[in-house]
Amino acid sequence: EAIGELAARYPSARVVALDAALPMLQQARARSMRGRSLLARLLGPFGRGGASAPAFVCADATSLPLPGVCVELVWSNLMLQWVNDQPRAFAEFRRVLKVGGLLTFTTFGPDTLKELARAFARVDGHTHVGRFVDMHDLGDMLVQSGFADPVMDMELITVTYPSPDALLAELKSIGATNQTRGRPRGLTGRGRRAALEAALLALARDGRIPATFEVVYGHAWKGEPKRTQDGLPIVKVERRHRG
């Protein structure tokens, strides 16, 4: 859906959609094709009005298969929280951006799924919910990666679910798997699952189970380079004209 909206917002631009998970990428491509007319599908890569249709690439954010200085906008929606090396991803975003290009993204902050973490704490001593990065640390990463004028913001959104199964099923559908170092190595048994469901039901309000999502918003620009590729500082000298 977002890919189609970006293509509609920038009709003369070439949109490249990247995802490390091939099934998610295939779903995005199918949704994009459903949103296009028969004529647009027949035109294939030329899209409508001469604009290129979106390209779909299976790739990792920390190793983009794109040449340097080739895009004007990097748009990332709820992806960075699944990346193990976020500074490296930011460095890759900056590498492919043109000078004056914009990075804009959303990700999850530390208070995300705090209710689920509390419920799991009653079940065992393992870590089940990811440790999401604070927005101030993300801002520092942007600066260290060479971005200019970073702006960060956040909001807390609480979604409620009718049952533990509904909550856990939705988390699975968005790819929220447990990749923390403290995760249990064995499968979740029936007893542990029942204990988790009971702990979640104990947190219910008005018969619904809350799940908090701390959504972090950020954007930053790629400014003029301050150093050469050899690491030497770039000093600009302007000639003054005598009046």
Language model features by range: what are they?
Residues 72-87, 107:
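A short SAM/SAH-binding and catalytic strip from SAM-dependent methyltransferases
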Residues 1, 23, 81, 110-111, ...:
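Short alpha-helical
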Residues 1-67, 73, 87-88:
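Class I SAM-dependent methyltransferase SAM/SAH-binding core
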Residues 165-243:
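C-terminal lobe and adjacent flexible extensions of AdoMet/dcAdoMet transferase-like proteins
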Residues 87-102:
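A short glycine-rich, Lys/Arg-flanked "PGG" loop and its adjoining helix->strand segment in the class I
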Residues 100-166, 173-187:
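Conserved catalytic/acceptor-binding region of the Class I
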Residues 11, 84, 98:
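Short conserved AdoMet
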